Amino acid sequence: MTEKLIFELGSPGRQGVLFPANDVPEIPPHELLPRDLIREQEVPLPEVSEGDAVRHFVRLSRMNFGVDVGFYPLGSCTMKYNPKVAEDAAGLSGFANIHPYQPDEISQGALQLMYETQQDLAEITGMDAFTLQPAAGAQGELTGMLIIKAYLESKGETGRNKVIVPDSAHGTNPATAALCGFKVVEVKSDQRGGVDLAALKQLLGPDVAALMLTNPSTLGLFEDNITEIAALVHQAGGLLYYDGANLNAIMGYARPGDMGFDVVHLNLHKTFGTPHGGGGPGSGPVGVKAELAPFLPKPVIIQREGNYLPDYHRPQSIGRVKAFFANFSVIVKAYTYLRSLGGKGLKEVSEHAVLNANYLMKQLSDHFRVPYQRTCMHEFVVSPPEDMKEQGIKTLDIAKRLLDYGYHPPTVYFPLIVEEALMFEPTETESKETLDEFAHNLIKVLAEARENPDKLRNAPYTTPIRRLDEVMAARKPLVGWFPE
């Protein structure tokens, strides 16, 4: 049953709250506010009772799907279970009730937590300094590329106006580079899914500012030639940027800084167990090697004479990228995750993430086309079997049918270089039984497609909204309600 909009509930004049009669003189709004700030018409608020409003939003909440509801194998998103102890930590009054304008002297606990988080992330990634300011991965990317741009300008290398990105890159990579004023150049992948070294050599030159790379890649493959790639980029005078979206695969085993990366951004809301989805809040810290540290956003939390304080005296800084001290509660949750697991636990996280991905890929390899015959890392990409084309079944149909089995679908049609791609990331927190059941049902969906293709083409059947007009949603997204 489709849920009505809250504006379609209730009736004119119905109130959710009855206020007592006003016992003070009313003052006309124009005597208190400039006329250009006063509404000329009443706001079209819904007129519903408190009970109807509560029921409406509870019904909506029961339609949500998240990691606390079921298996969520959305590739390149690391939808792992988020431990609830982190929520308890973030809710402690010392963290929840502080204000960013408090004096440093009475904010030492919060400042210490941020400082130690910076240090922990630097150790995990092999970087020398970190900022916690960026509010999400994309803003972290932007911050990292602005740091690279400022660094090159400080050296007088303003002619470096190109950024190289692989054809398997996250879409945010070229978008970020373009937003920073760089020209984006694509480098092709080789037959094994890695960066084509010959193609890279052709692109490198005195006009290249950086190569943006994810390792493991969005294909779920480790870049075997990473040290050679780093050497080539550095020999050409460029910098190597690490998109940390896939760090969950290598913690305790490999560090971007040791591979030759100069700048990294991370996603605390992916790798480090803080909830994400629905627009946030997130956290996208950025780490750099020592020579780029002066350009980090200010303030950076430092320790001096036993005290923790924000350092604003950074004349080469790119400036603030976020008000106050970032999404602080997310940092508290990530700190709790880091300290709960420790170094040994983080290493086991990556072990299990890689094990689960390879186990699931093996389960599906006889039923789907696997484009790269390699051991995967934390995620993998497959394509539907050839006979699905004969049935007129597309990746989207398979994904939609999975909804009826109670799963969130995998990422579809990405990376773009894989035909009809389905990208799975099971994460480390799923059991063997969950993976077995999921594989069984996914294979069952293929059998349904062969027996009755229309069953998939018309799926899903159990969701409140079945199939959106994808073109209209992309070109004319109406996400708000407006009175007729």
From Swiss-Prot:
InterPro entries attached here? Aminotrans_V_dom (IPR000192), GcvPB (IPR023012), GDC-P_C (IPR049316), GDC_P (IPR020581), PyrdxlP-dep_Trfase (IPR015424), PyrdxlP-dep_Trfase_major (IPR015421), PyrdxlP-dep_Trfase_small (IPR015422)
- Give the UniProt record's GO annotations in the biological process aspect: glycine decarboxylation via glycine cleavage system
* Sites bearing N6-(pyridoxal phosphate)lysine, chain numbering: 270
The alphabetized UniProt keywords are: Oxidoreductase, Pyridoxal phosphate
Q: GO cellular component terms?
A: cytosol; glycine cleavage complex
Matching SUPFAM superfamilies: PLP-dependent transferases
Q: List the disulfide bonds.
A: none
- Cofactors (names): pyridoxal 5'-phosphate
**Entry-linked HAMAP family:** GcvPB (MF_00713)
Q: How does it assemble?
A: The glycine cleavage system is composed of four proteins: P, T, L and H. In this organism, the P 'protein' is a heterodimer of two subunits.
**What does the protein in this record do?**
The glycine cleavage system catalyzes the degradation of glycine. The P protein binds the alpha-amino group of glycine through its pyridoxal phosphate cofactor; CO(2) is released and the remaining methylamine moiety is then transferred to the lipoamide cofactor of the H protein.
The record's section on PANTHER family has: GLYCINE DEHYDROGENASE (DECARBOXYLATING), MITOCHONDRIAL, GLYCINE DEHYDROGENASE, DECARBOXYLATING
What name appears for this protein in its UniProt entry?
Probable glycine dehydrogenase (decarboxylating) subunit 2
Which species is this UniProt entry from? Desulforamulus reducens (strain ATCC BAA-1160 / DSM 100696 / MI-1)
